[in-house]
Amino acid sequence: MPHFPPNAYFCTMQPSEELKNHIETEIIPRYESFDAAHGTDHVRTVIAQSLDLARHYDVDADMIYAVAAYHDTGLARGRELHHIHSGEILLADTELRRWFTAEQLAVMRDAVEDHRASSDHAPRTIYGRIVAEADRC
């Protein structure tokens, strides 16, 4: 996997600097404790791929960035239900309310829950479809 330096997202779709700062300091470091396949390089790759895919759709860059950043955070509670736990972690982060409405957060939770490749259903939103596809790259 390629290594992406912090804040290096190579597309025209850019999330807000304040949101990036929060995620870079509070969320991405959590991936350091996960297995090598789900470490910081992985999450940075998924973020970059998600932003690249998202530029083809009418979607919110901040939402895509956050969904991609949180998609595997639930691994801290175990692999089997990590997609559900990741959604819970996203909703529990009260800082996100600075950038997102309750409705946006619900869409983001659904997208995080739906990213899993082994899921028996298709992602419910375009956000879930984008991050699920980026996670497979």
Language-model region placement:
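Intrinsically disordered, low-complexity cationic segments
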Residues: 1-5, 21
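A general marker of short, structured functional hotspots
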Residues: 5-6, 27, 111, 123
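Acidic/His-rich, divalent-metal-binding segments that scaffold phosphate/diphosphate chemistry
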Residues: 12-81
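Divalent metal-dependent catalytic cores for phosphoryl transfer on phosphate-bearing substrates
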Residues: 57-137
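Short, positively charged and aromatic/hydrophobic N-terminal segments
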Residues: 3, 9-12
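Intrinsic disorder/low-complexity signature
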Residues: 4-6, 38, 132
